[in-house]
């Protein structure tokens, strides 16, 4: 189970009443205090993340959740599932000082453990807990949320609640999230995903994305090896200078994954990343593909579905089973994501940040985190671009592949709550 205690340990400190570490390693600095509200967040002094959790008192006035249903431009097909519309859960938390935080629990069948109905029930339980709790420190609130929404089983809902809480706190101390997470940058550049489609459709999408300024295409593969190669050839013809990420979503056997790399090698194509080539529980196969991909073809392999907890991350690191870990908040929660970031950075493993099929609420939170930390080699935060409607008001600014984050408090996105039914 992820806990605030384990997070504090990863930050180089321990929760009271335990003695603090002798060699603290703060993960990030945060800006401002509640007393500094209204000041310029770029000009205020800093204090450590653990201090915010230990000193900021959270007093929840209202907390509620509603279904967040949004149509897609086209069905989103990957090796393990097909999504025809987004059926997520929106979460709204209001503090006693009037600051409102927004979160989203993304649901992707066969990837997240929850479906929408389960997520609604568990989110409601968490909201009731928050409403009925007395004022307590942020760290304790997050720990209580983790207890009622434990492990990977409820990670997506936990992430949504954590997002809303942290967004509200950021607004209360008058800082944007990218500053809260370290302030490394106020923008990111994302790839864009081409789902499993025909070679003609893939070529059409690649041509469109090229005109929109996307230099990195993430191609979903893993259902049919021959068709995957044909799609790659079609994309290469219309976007010859693009960088490729292959994402098999567990779809290949180890020998098939290596065969794909061999065929691409013959075409003169080297992907910059090969994501989750084999089944999540095929640890031996993952390590084998990673060794061959890097040693023979110079291709890095990322663990996505195989990394659903800090325990998984440690296993991957110890066994040299992948070159990159893909952090998705819906898999591990926000607190869990921070734990894995610290573990990976300490070990020298590269990091990727991704998401499920989400609106700009969840994607905005993840984008702020990525910009603030500045430590992600691969950024895959594109799925709001696949939606036919955008229910989120304000938030980050989009210019092709670039997301720009402003100085607005929190992640700055919100919903017209009366129209979220």
From Swiss-Prot:
Instruction: Answer yes or no on keyword Metal-binding.
Output: yes
Q: Which UniProt keywords apply?
A: Isomerase, Magnesium, Metal-binding
Per UniProt, Mg(2+) binds at: 247, 275, 304
Q: Name one Pfam family in it.
A: MR_MLE_N
Q: What is its EC number?
A: 5.1.1.-
The residues listed in the UniProt record as binding substrate, with positions renumbered to this chain, are 193, 218-220, 328, 380-382
Q: Report the co-factor binding details.
A: Binds 1 Mg(2+) ion per subunit.
Q: Which SUPFAM superfamilies does the entry mention?
A: Enolase C-terminal domain-like, Enolase N-terminal domain-like
Which EC class, in a word? isomerase
Q: Which InterPro entries match?
A: Dipeptide_epimerase (IPR034603), Enolase-like_C_sf (IPR036849), Enolase-like_N (IPR029017), Enolase_C-like (IPR029065), Mandelate_racemase_C (IPR013342), Mandelate_racemase_N_dom (IPR013341)
GO molecular function annotations of the record? magnesium ion binding; racemase and epimerase activity; racemase and epimerase activity, acting on amino acids and derivatives
Question: Which cofactors does this gene product need?
Answer: Mg(2+)
Q: Among the record's GO biological process terms, what is one?
A: peptide metabolic process
**What's this protein's function?**
Catalyzes the epimerization of various hydrophobic and polar dipeptides. Has epimerase activity with L-Ala-L-Ala, L-Ala-L-Ser, L-Ala-L-Thr and L-Ala-L-Trp (in vitro).
- What is the similarity comment for this entry? Belongs to the mandelate racemase/muconate lactonizing enzyme family.
Other noteworthy facts: Part of a large, functionally divergent protein family. Protein modeling and substrate docking were used to predict the substrate specificity, prior to biochemical analysis.
Record's protein name: L-Ala-D/L-amino acid epimerase
What species does this protein belong to?
Populus trichocarpa
């Amino acid at each position: 189970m992820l806990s605030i205690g384990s997070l504090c340990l990863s930050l180089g400190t321990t929760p009271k009443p335990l003695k603090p570490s002798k060699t603290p390693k703060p993960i990030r600095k945060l800006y401002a205090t509640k007393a500094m509200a209204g000041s310029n967040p770029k000009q205020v002094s800093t204090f450590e993340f653990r201090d915010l959790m230990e000193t900021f008192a959270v007093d929840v006035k209202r907390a509620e959740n509603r279904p967040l249903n949004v149509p897609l431009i086209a069905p989103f097909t990957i090796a393990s599932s097909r999504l025809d519309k987004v059926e997520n859960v929106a979460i709204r938390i209001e503090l006693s000082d009037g600051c409102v935080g927004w979160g989203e629990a993304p649901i992707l069948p066969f990837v997240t453990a929850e479906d929408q109905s389960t997520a609604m029930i568990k989110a409601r339980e968490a909201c009731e807990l928050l409403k009925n709790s007395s004022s307590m420190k942020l760290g304790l609130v997050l720990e209580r949320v983790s207890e009622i929404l434990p492990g990977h089983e409820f990670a997506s809902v936990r992430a949504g609640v954590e997002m809303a809480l942290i967004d509200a706190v950021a607004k209360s101390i008058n800082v944007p999230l990218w500053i809260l997470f370290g302030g490394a940058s106020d923008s990111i550049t994302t790839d864009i995903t081409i789902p499993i489609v025909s070679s003609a459709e893939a070529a059409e999408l690649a041509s469109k994305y090229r005109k929109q300024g996307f230099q990195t295409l993430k191609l979903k593969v893993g259902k049919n090896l021959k068709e995957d190669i044909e799609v790659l050839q079609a994309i290469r013809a219309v976007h010859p200078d693009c960088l490729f990420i292959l994402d098999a979503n567990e779809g290949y056997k180890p020998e098939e994954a290596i065969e794909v790399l061999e065929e691409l090698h013959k075409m003169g194509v080297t992907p910059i990343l090969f994501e989750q080539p084999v089944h999540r529980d095929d640890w031996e196969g993952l390590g084998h593909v990673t060794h061959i991909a890097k040693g023979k073809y110079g291709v890095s392999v990322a663990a996505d579905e195989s990394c659903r907890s800090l325990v998984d991350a440690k296993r991957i690191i110890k066994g040299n089973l992948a070159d990159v870990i893909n952090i998705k908040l819906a898999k591990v929660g926000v607190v869990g994501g921070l734990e894995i970031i610290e573990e990976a950075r300490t070990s020298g493993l590269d990091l990727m940040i991704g998401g499920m099929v989400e609106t700009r609420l969840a994607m905005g939170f993840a984008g702020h985190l990525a910009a603030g930390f500045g430590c992600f080699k691969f950024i895959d935060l594109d799925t709001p671009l696949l939606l036919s409607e955008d229910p989120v008001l304000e938030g980050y600014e989009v210019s092709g592949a670039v997301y720009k984050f402003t100085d607005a408090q929190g992640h700055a996105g919100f919903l017209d709550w009366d129209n979220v039914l």
